[in-house]
Amino acid sequence: MYDNLKSLGITNPEEIDRYSLRQEANNDILKIYFQKDKGEFFAKRVKFKYPRQRKTVVADGVGQGYKEVQEISPNLRYIIDELDQICQRDRSEVDLKRKILDDLRHLESVVTNKISEIEADLEKLTRK
C-alpha cells in the first residue's frame, strides 16, 4: 500500500499530516509535512520537484494551429492520489471524533434536564 510514496523514501506514510503543491516555472513543487513530535516547534517536511509534462495539442478544430500545454507529471498524480487518501482518512477520523463529542454533550444535556424534571416531580409528591 502507498507504493508511490514508499518509492520516494517515505517509510511511514501514516505519519503524514498534510501536503502542499504549487507550480514554480516549469516545475511542480510538492511538500509533504509529517506530524510533529512532542517538544518540536516545526513539523518535519520533505520537498520534491517534478518537471511539468509538455504536450502539443491542436489549438482549434478548424485550422492547422498547434499549441503547447503543460500538465502535471503522471507520477506526481499517483502520489497526490495516495496523499489524498491519507489526508482524507485523517480528516474523517477528526470529523467522527467531533460528532461523538457533540453527541455526548447533547446526551449530557438531555440527562441533566430529565433528572431535573424527575426531581421536580418528586418534590411535588413530598409536598402532599
UniProtKB/Swiss-Prot annotation:
InterPro entries: UPF0325. It comes from the Bacteria. Transmembrane segments: none annotated. It holds the Pfam family DUF3461. Belongs to the UPF0325 family. This is UPF0325 protein YaeH. The lineage of its organism: Bacteria, Pseudomonadati, Pseudomonadota, Gammaproteobacteria, Enterobacterales.
